[in-house]
């Protein structure tokens, strides 16, 4: 993943469709997919998780079968997925789509993910599950 130091290293050109919930992002992306050789790449922090279909406006199974989207249903809900993970995965998908002659179309409304993709993130250590457990135990004991 690109960090702040190399944030201006260019990605292959791509189309970005973003906006608030229920603004027609998916419909716009599907319209492009009907007309052009595109690769749809989801930018949604909930749609990455399998089974979290309600409340996320995740395209239904028929739509996904007809118009596959990268980065949908790639994790189980108990598995962490960070903005850094997204940026790395999306960059790979954009590069792969471009190399195969398809137009990468990044579609979704998770602004932090888009920002991480465009500008990178400062280097930070990974979350420490043991430290998290200790903090949760302490909070439970002390309130």
For the regions a language model picked out, list residue spans one by one.
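Phosphate/pyrophosphate-binding catalytic cores of soluble transferases and nucleic-acid-acting enzymes
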Residues: 1-143
